[in-house]
Amino acid sequence: MSSLRRIGKLGERSSILFLCDMQEKFRQSIVFFPEIVSVAARMLQGAKKLEMPVIITEHYPKGLGPTVPELGADGLKKYEKTSFSMLTPEIEEKLQSIPDLRSIVLCGIETQACIMSTALDLLDKGYDVHVVADACSSRSQVDRLFALSRMRQSGAFLTTSEGVLLQLLGNAKHPKFKEVQKIIMEPAPDSGLLSIFRGPNLFSA
């Protein structure tokens, strides 16, 4: 168990997907919003295929609106919050009820606010945190870059949507491989990662 935690290996029965605050009011202000939501929707489809638990939050929905329909989360419970962190008492209780839970796969907005606060709280609780970089964004690409760097410094694993789904499958003989393969057959839309990763010193060991 300790070696799995140290290297950040994902398992479908020990992981949960977090989708953070993909709401209507952010549509016009978040850089690459359509692409981020599209990638997060892929993650949600994959989680459903693999029968993984999913947590979806809405930050002050009275002011920021509902979750956008293109995420494909109709019928799923939405946890309302006002804290930046997704780790509210209700959600923490939910996590504690899941046997053998080790890894949280994290997507959403904004990277420097709710995503980073959530990641740091989860790391502090001893969970492995996998930040899906192509499914997280901010109003500012500078904030996005430094938040990703900060989370990595604190012990989170930066990854991509396709990387996560393939690691969760683990084997082409997995009974759900063909179904998940259809989700990732086309490359994920460009969410601007290459343009912000031009500061290699931020990500040096």
From Swiss-Prot:
<dbReference type="InterPro" id="IPR050993">
    <property type="entry name" value="Isochorismatase_domain"/>
</dbReference>
<dbReference type="InterPro" id="IPR000868">
    <property type="entry name" value="Isochorismatase-like_dom"/>
</dbReference>
<dbReference type="Pfam" id="PF00857">
    <property type="entry name" value="Isochorismatase"/>
</dbReference>
<protein>
    <recommendedName>
        <fullName>Isochorismatase domain-containing protein 2</fullName>
    </recommendedName>
</protein>
<dbReference type="InterPro" id="IPR036380">
    <property type="entry name" value="Isochorismatase-like_sf"/>
</dbReference>
<comment type="similarity">
    <text>Belongs to the isochorismatase family.</text>
</comment>
